[in-house]
Amino acid sequence: MVYQGNRITVTMLEDGIANMQYNAENESVNKFDTETNKQFAEVVNALEKADDVKGLIVTSSKGVFIAGADITEFVASFKQSEEEIKDWVININDAFNRFEDLPFPKVAAINGAALGGGCEMTLVCEYRVMSDKAIIGLPETQLGIFPGFGGTVRSTRVIGIDNALELIATGAPKKALDALKLGLVDATVAADDLQDAAIDLVKKCISGELDWKAKREEKLVAVKLNQLEQAMAFNSAKGMIFAKANPKQYPAPALAIAAIEKHVNLPRDKAIEVEAAGFAKAAKTPQAESLVGLFLSDQLVKKLAKQHSKKAHEINEAAVLGAGIMGGGIAYQAASKGLPIIMKDIKSEQLDLGMGEASKLLGKMVDRGKMTPAKMGETLSRIRPTLNYGDFAETDIVIEAVVENPNVKRAVLKEVEGLVKDDCILASNTSTISITFLAEALERPENFVGMHFFNPVHRMPLVEVIRGEKSSEEAIATTVALASKMGKVPVVVNDCPGFLVNRVLFPYFGAFDLLLKQGADFAHVDKVMEKFGWPMGPAYLIDVVGLDTGVHGAEVMAEGFPDRMKPDYKGAIELLYENKRLGQKNGVGFYKYEMDKRGKPKKVADEATYELLKTTTDSEKQTFDDQAIIDRTMLAFCNETVRCLEDNIVSTPSEADMAMIMGVGFPPFRGGPCRYIDQMGLDNYLALCEKYAHLGKAYEAPQKIRDMAAAGETFYATA
């Protein structure tokens, strides 16, 4: 035994070959946390003194090779100064460099995901052999940072500038064959053959059959490209990256490129200093704080879903009531994840529409080479369309997805309850109607919950699981388990008008309506909010949702929260609806829609909209700068999010933030409404509320904000 730790062990195998194995005790995955970094430095000390080691393989005892750095430690680490972060990273890099410089060949045996620091660990080895089931990559830019353990330095020298820039800037992991084509690994083998293949490579290095020293030397010197070739590689990468992401919103890819441009002509040690300085700069951006926080919130939401699922009943078969686009989308989602599902409607043409929707979505996967025609047929066979309830006797859960009308829903739910087994869960896919109210029609209200999918079902990851007054924990657990089984991210919320997402969204639309009444141009508001980071502004969003849906939702919200969601004027959204402008669904809303060459609706300006809006605009039009537009819309949005926490509609800031990002597209780089308030500062946010309080209750600071500001608290504890 060369080294024995609770994160890493080094044992001798045969012929002077050592096995350095990552094996974090009591952990599901290996990661570079403080203790692992400490032990890795100790391993290097031991190996520098181990005269009997002629070669070494790097392995993992887990299903994952190394998942990367311990993201939970970033929160505290990134609170340090830029200089302190740089020194921290350089100190870790010292062990990586010394490991690379050991006087014998090293081969990484990549059995599972080698991401971030895990990929960087493999790059300090001379050779890399990979299981054909593994993945490898440098996803750090998705956290608002970039590789800091030598990843930008070694990748450019191993796979070339252009390939390294694409790998780092996109953050997308590579499958084994793609990694082999890039030169990121030297061989791929079946998982069972991995260790033998790694040992064989080491033996070839020891015997001189492979020139491992030359492989190492390439990583220690500048990149071997002339200035023109370098300029072409960087210009191409910048064009690709900046077309995909605004560097003002997501600066990490641009900062990574800048660091690489500085260090490509430097030897390793100097290059790593440049990388460390760039990493520290990225780590101090608000985007890094938000995206690291978002990663941790995502982990918490998934952990909570697992906890909620503990009391779940087994789900062997589901059913959906109501076909069409929504029912077809739900059926597709279940079937594509291996769950048999019955799709019932009272009209055969609706069943055809639902099956057509599922078939269309699966057909696209076949066209993209992600599914075989045989697999498509197998998936479609899991969906059983029917006009009657004959097959419902053994169904474990029924999702009601009929028209958004409380009387229709109550009648359908009451009918199906009498035809299913006593422990069958009933779930309503409603976006606004009270679950407690719908439950009044049922004999077994404890078996009834809300299950709000977002449209389009196959794209939107969020599912709100709504607890009514009488919903049992088993019913909630089973519905959460179903959502997870369908590949969705469930967030459990308590019942109220609009639940969580729509309750927060409608004050945002209300703030938008008020801006238009006072003279703002809807197209300009859209541009401002898109620049802020939304995928679409409020006018375009309501066109996509449908103005009829928007007006119906606004009526429900006005009845539920009249003090702040019932305007005393007719707004632009209601006016356009009355003039039969429904948005994309009938080609005219705030914008006019024309089909592009791909058959997708493209928005264009429409003078008729401006003529109509003149009738609702105040005679004395006001002008608004961009910041005022942002402040007014985001105050209404964020205040209602906080009120949902106050009212215990949602349990944690993490769940609230994740729901708003997944459900309505809140800018991820801003971390969600709660983190947005944190970054603004509670005192500053409170002052902004007071500045606009004269506009109405929606702009007044919730008591929770006042209490937190007085106590010096934040939504996310600072380390």
Curated annotation (Swiss-Prot):
Gene Ontology CC, one term = fatty acid beta-oxidation multienzyme complex
Binding annotation for substrate: D298, N502
Q: What is its EC number?
A: 4.2.1.17, 5.1.2.3, 5.3.3.8, 1.1.1.35
Name the residues annotated as catalytic in the UniProt entry.
H452
- UniProt-annotated stretches for the region Enoyl-CoA hydratase/isomerase: 1-190
Instruction: Cite the annotated pathway.
Output: Lipid metabolism; fatty acid beta-oxidation
Q: Entry's Pfam families?
A: 3HCDH, 3HCDH_N, ECH_1
Provide the binding site for NAD(+). M326, D345, V402, V403, E404, K409, S431, N455
| GO BP annotations listed | fatty acid beta-oxidation
Renumbered to this chain, region (3-hydroxyacyl-CoA dehydrogenase) spans: 313-719
Q: Can you list the disulfide-bonded cysteine pairs?
A: none
What are the protein's GO molecular function terms?
3-hydroxybutyryl-CoA epimerase activity; delta(3)-delta(2)-enoyl-CoA isomerase activity; enoyl-CoA hydratase activity; long-chain-3-hydroxyacyl-CoA dehydrogenase activity; NAD+ binding
Annotated catalysed reactions: a (3S)-3-hydroxyacyl-CoA + NAD(+) = a 3-oxoacyl-CoA + NADH + H(+); a (3S)-3-hydroxyacyl-CoA = a (2E)-enoyl-CoA + H2O; a 4-saturated-(3S)-3-hydroxyacyl-CoA = a (3E)-enoyl-CoA + H2O; (3S)-3-hydroxybutanoyl-CoA = (3R)-3-hydroxybutanoyl-CoA
Q: Does the keyword Lipid metabolism apply?
A: yes
Q: Spell out the residues of the site Important for catalytic activity.
A: E120, E140
Record keywords: Repeat included?
no
Q: Where does the secretion signal sit in this chain?
A: none
Keywords, alphabetical: Fatty acid metabolism, Isomerase, Lipid degradation, Lipid metabolism, Lyase, Multifunctional enzyme, NAD, Oxidoreductase
Q: What does this protein do?
A: Involved in the aerobic and anaerobic degradation of long-chain fatty acids via beta-oxidation cycle. Catalyzes the formation of 3-oxoacyl-CoA from enoyl-CoA via L-3-hydroxyacyl-CoA. It can also use D-3-hydroxyacyl-CoA and cis-3-enoyl-CoA as substrate.
Q: Which family does it belong to?
A: In the N-terminal section; belongs to the enoyl-CoA hydratase/isomerase family. In the C-terminal section; belongs to the 3-hydroxyacyl-CoA dehydrogenase family.
Q: Which PANTHER family match?
A: TRIFUNCTIONAL ENZYME SUBUNIT ALPHA, TRIFUNCTIONAL ENZYME SUBUNIT ALPHA, MITOCHONDRIAL
Could you give the subunit structure recorded for this chain? Heterotetramer of two alpha chains (FadB) and two beta chains (FadA).
Name of the protein in question = Fatty acid oxidation complex subunit alpha
Which organism's genome codes for this protein?
Answer: Psychrobacter arcticus (strain DSM 17307 / VKM B-2377 / 273-4)
This chain is encoded by the gene named fadB
